[in-house]
């Protein structure tokens, strides 16, 4: 047996998971790192701290698993997407704080570019919308703020990358400046049809091509970890953004396969095969994976507030003492909030509405409304938002035949059943919780030649429990009608 080390670099912590060659977890290490909010709407990370915590958890996982680096088959990497790092090629040191995917500082720039008529080109080439969420305007902002940085970038002295590129550069001792197609597809700069950095979009944002990484297959070779870091040279063979890694880890490999990750927010993806299907309903078209030079695509929708709504009940309202109490409440109410609807538009609404001006509300309350109804309405809001995404996917011709789920919320059986009922779709929960890291490990195993093909991932996927829809169409229809009225109110000026 030769284990695989998956590095899972997230928004709030760096993690390392050691897998055996059959996909079972041998050891886990995790450490948080600091979040910085220097101005309203700004979110930054220290890229050097991200590197140091990643290296520390990699060493810790190996120690916990009793595995020496020379015995590893490969390293795989998965990462928070869109977060932007700019560093000096010669020293390997960041020249500015990393601008996190949540950062909104470039909202005005995006509006200006939209007014100039750039968005149709952005969508046509990248499958994305013109939004501060993506890397392109973040990188442009860094270069625009400092003429000296721009001059160094144009001279080829600086390197840009998303977190995967940054870690690869440091792990390989500066030998490799590369990313994979899934991460490149989130930059606002990469043409997902032709598989090249877009000259037109780079010009529109004044991005020097010299700073951009090489784009490789998701199961490609990304160099070797230098011996000084882990004790021996180890090949890096699998790289993917976190949501795409979870899609792969869930064995969603073909059209009709879909997954949704329920954490603080929610990310849903539906596999579209080799067709880059552009959404007519404000979903994102993104690269699901690139293998052997062939790109596979997915439609993606994101919900800003999922588990965060439950945290709000606990931390701000004090309605519950722990997230686990929601299961007890749902067991009592059977998912029926008695006509109460909560729209958790605390930061606007995500896909398919993309309405930054929407605001949270609760509607339908009476004197009979109590704690249980409020808690049920809050949890149900996650299922309703997912139904909005599913309907948009369906109208775009990408409705999944079933939905595989992961993330912190899915340990709650009552939520999973409510989700299946609301979606009118079978919902499957896997045995393995570490789906994102498992996807990176599977890509590494594939790249290293240990897996004969992607189908090995499907063969190793194990079901924990399936949830079948149990409500009648009339019940679901009535509930959805109430939800849509509530959303319309939340979006009213």
Where are these regions (language model features)?
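N-terminal glycine/serine-rich phosphate-binding loop of ATP-dependent small-molecule kinases
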Residues: 1-96, 124, 214, 230-235, ...
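Active-site core segments that coordinate phosphate-bearing ligands/cofactors
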Residues: 5-7, 107, 113-177, 188-199, ...
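Residues that line or immediately flank small-molecule/substrate-binding pockets and catalytic motifs
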Residues: 33, 79, 102, 219, ...
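Short, conserved phosphate/pyrophosphate- and ester-handling motifs at nucleotide-, phospho-/glycolipid
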Residues: 46, 103, 242
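Short beta-strand-loop/turn "lid" adjacent to the catalytic site in phosphate-handling enzymes
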Residues: 63-101, 126-135, 168-191, 216, ...
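A conserved helix-loop-beta module that forms one wall/lid of the active-site cleft
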Residues: 205-220
């Amino acid at each position: 047996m030769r284990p695989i080390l998956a590095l899972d670099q997230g928004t709030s912590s760096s993690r390392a998971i050691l897998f055996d060659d059959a996909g079972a977890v041998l050891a886990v290490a995790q450490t948080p790192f600091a979040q910085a909010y220097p101005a309203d709407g700004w979110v930054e990370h220290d890229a050097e701290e991200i590197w140091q915590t990643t290296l520390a958890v990699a060493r810790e996982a190996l120690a916990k698993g009793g595995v020496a680096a020379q015995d590893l088959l490969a390293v795989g990497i998965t990462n928070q997407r869109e977060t932007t790092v700019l560093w000096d090629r010669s020293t390997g040191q960041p020249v500015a704080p990393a601008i996190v995917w949540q950062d909104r500082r470039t909202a005005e720039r995006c509006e200006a570019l939209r007014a100039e008529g750039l968005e149709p080109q952005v969508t046509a080439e990248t499958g994305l919308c013109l939004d501060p969420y993506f890397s392109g305007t973040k990188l442009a902002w860094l270069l625009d703020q400092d003429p000296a940085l721009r001059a160094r970038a144009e001279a080829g002295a600086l390197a840009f990358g998303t977190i995967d590129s940054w870690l690869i550069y440091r792990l390989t001792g500066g030998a490799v400046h590369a990313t994979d197609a899934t991460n490149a597809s989130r930059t606002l700069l990469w043409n997902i049809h032709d598989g090249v950095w877009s000259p037109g979009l780079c010009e529109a944002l004044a991005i020097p091509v010299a700073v951009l990484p090489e784009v490789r297959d998701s199961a490609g070779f990304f160099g070797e970890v230098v011996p000084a870091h882990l004790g021996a040279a180890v090949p890096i063979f699998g790289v993917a953004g976190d949501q795409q890694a979870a899609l792969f880890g869930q064995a969603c490999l073909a059209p009709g396969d879909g997954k949704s990750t329920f954490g603080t927010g929610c990310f849903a993806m539906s596999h579209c095969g080799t067709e880059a299907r552009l959404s007519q309903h404000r979903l994102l078209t993104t690269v699901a994976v690139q293998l052997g030079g062939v790109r596979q695509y997915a439609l993606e929708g994101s919900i800003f507030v999922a588990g965060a709504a439950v945290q709000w009940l606990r931390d701000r309202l004090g309605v519950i003492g722990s997230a686990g109490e929601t299961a007890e409440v749902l067991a009592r109410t059977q998912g029926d909030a008695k006509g109460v609807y909560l729209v958790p538009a605390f930061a606007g609404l995500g896909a398919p509405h993309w309405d930054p001006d929407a605001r949270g509300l609760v509607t339908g309350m009476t004197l009979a409304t109590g704690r249980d109804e409020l808690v049920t309405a809050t949890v149900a809001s996650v299922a309703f938002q997912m139904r909005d995404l599913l309907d948009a996917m369906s109208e775009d011709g990408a409705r999944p035949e079933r939905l595989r789920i992961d993330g912190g919320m899915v340990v709650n059986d009552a939520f999973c059943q409510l989700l299946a009922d609301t979606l009118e779709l079978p919902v499957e929960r896997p045995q393995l919780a570490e789906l994102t890291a498992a996807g990176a490990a599977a890509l590494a195993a594939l790249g290293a030649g240990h897996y004969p093909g992607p189908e090995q991932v499907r063969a190793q996927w194990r079901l924990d429990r399936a949830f079948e829809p149990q409500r009648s169409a009339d019940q679901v229809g009535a509930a959805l009608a109430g939800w849509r009225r509530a959303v319309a109110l939340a979006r009213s000026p």
